[in-house]
Amino acid sequence: MSGTLMRMAGPTVVAEGLSGASLNEVVRVGEERLLGEIIRIEGDRATIQVYEETAGLALGEPVEASGEPLAVELGPGLLGSVFDGVQRPLSELAAREGDFLGRGASLPALDRTRAWEFEPAVAPGDRVEGGARLGVARAPGAPDHPVVVPPGVTGRVAEVRGGARRVDEPAVLLEGGATLALLERWPVRRPRPARRRLPPDVPFLTGQRVLDCFFPVSAGGTAVVPGGFGTGKTVLEQSLAKWAAADVVVYVGCGERGNEMSEVLDEFPRLEDPRTGGPLLARTVMIVNTSNMPVAAREASIYTGCAIAEYFRDMGRSVALMIDSTSRWAEALREISARLEEMPGEEGYPTYLASRLARFYERAGRVETLGGAEGAVTMVGAVSPPGGDLSEPVTQCSLRATGALWALSADLAHRRHYPAVDWSVSFTLEGDRLAGWFEREAGDGFGALRDEARKLLQRERELAEVAELVGTESLQDAERLVLESARLLREGFLRQSALDPADATCPPAKAFEMLRLFLEWHRRAGAAVGAGVPLRSILDTGLGARLLRLAQLPAAEVPGAAAALRADLSEALARLEAE
């Protein structure tokens, strides 16, 4: 089916003669066959958002409908790849087109020339259905890739073709003539089905103490990370990609500056995967859409990333989906809405911004897959509020749709406190659901310690305001002890060095032992001050400096060091009280 162009407004064009087309159908626009998607239908007129630059299009040029929705290719070869927002392989296009891509440039997302050794797990006569495992695809230098039956497909196996196969060649033939290849196509805007959702009672461990202990998120949960320029969003996301409990990382660079994305593309291949010792990129899929790319492709990029994440989830893997940033995605939505002449909402964003964000974040979750395995997609969405204003619409809509807020503070970043998570603003809605896991796996009493630490930090904020007015020396020793204990907690527990091998990640058991010792120091020093021991004498023991060095010890050495420090603390305080 084909129509003709009758109107153009930036990335949005209108074509007539497409009466049989459907919503979200992919079309090719103009003589250069630019990729587009139908977003509105009125009679035989279709409004299309074009995923490429529309300059040079002329009225009357043909528009050809494909009959298919916008879909991604899913199969062996995804890991380690870099795509744009509509899953065009950027490395292959750069080799063919050069540094600047021509309009209408198109290549299959997955390499059609590479051979994979298919080792089948089914035999003729077996009955298969969506989610069933067909076998494993292997290739030199690539991780094993399970091949599963796409959702909605059922039948009895008629023939199995093992051995060397390209991704588009039939590997399993079903009775009735249907064929299954190593790859499948899936519409990006349709969530992949699962057998059932599992309760969010297992944490998504990030390796960052401030997040795991104070603001945990469940596996399959959602978190929003607002932060202005220079607050460490990218460094935090790299730390999460490297150390978080995720088998696969899908990174969506949505609308960020070109130089920032260049840095990410340059740094990610050089990051070492601590699990395997190989490059981190080997278990990462990157979707790149810079701010100078067409806004329509930016709007589609997060759905592309989500469809890829759900595909790996259905293999029984834990997937971390990172979006940087949802603010740029919302700006693309705002521009498209303006081109469609829709009624604007707050700050010009469309009135359906909240529902679109909620619908997207609902695709996260820990599930039992159709094949009976357990998989999860955990979403971490960065937000770039102008001037760090958390009251702007994108941040507020994200907060309503997610389970945790990891707010980054410019003040902490300027003080070189990383991760610059502001504990006075951040929160989680899943702390109570995950408390049982931390009590079992980290240590009994973990929740009580966390609450005590929060109260200590809150008390420090109150005393800091008083100290700014009257000076620290005017405070009583008990109040100055609160300031000193909170300082030790901030510098020795909440702050982590991404460059220190022992401190870059922290298992829950180590974090529990550290937190227990920090708070024990505060309680016992407080008792000594109450008994008349001068605070200065306690600080002169040097035990505070030893507390700060706990973070630099490997996890296996922390219990022994904590026991020695606890004994020295008892001895020092007993000596001071006896004087």
UniProtKB/Swiss-Prot annotation:
InterPro entries per the UniProt record, alphabetical: ATP-synt_VA_C, ATP-synth_a_Xtn, ATP_synth_asu-like_sf, ATPase_F1/V1/A1_a/bsu_N, ATPase_F1/V1/A1_a/bsu_N_sf, ATPase_F1/V1/A1_a/bsu_nucl-bd, ATPase_F1/V1_b/a_C, P-loop_NTPase
Gene3D superfamilies: 2.40.30.20, 2.40.50.100, Bovine Mitochondrial F1-atpase, Atp Synthase Beta Chain, Chain D, domain 3 (1.10.1140.10), P-loop containing nucleotide triphosphate hydrolases (3.40.50.300)
Residues that hold ATP according to the record: 227-234
A molecular-function term among this protein's GO annotations: proton-transporting ATP synthase activity, rotational mechanism
GO CC annotation: proton-transporting ATP synthase complex
Family from the record: Belongs to the ATPase alpha/beta chains family.
Function: Produces ATP from ADP in the presence of a proton gradient across the membrane. The V-type alpha chain is a catalytic subunit.
Protein name as catalogued: V-type ATP synthase alpha chain
Originating species: Anaeromyxobacter dehalogenans (strain 2CP-1 / ATCC BAA-258)
Upper classification of the organism: Bacteria, Pseudomonadati, Myxococcota, Myxococcia, Myxococcales
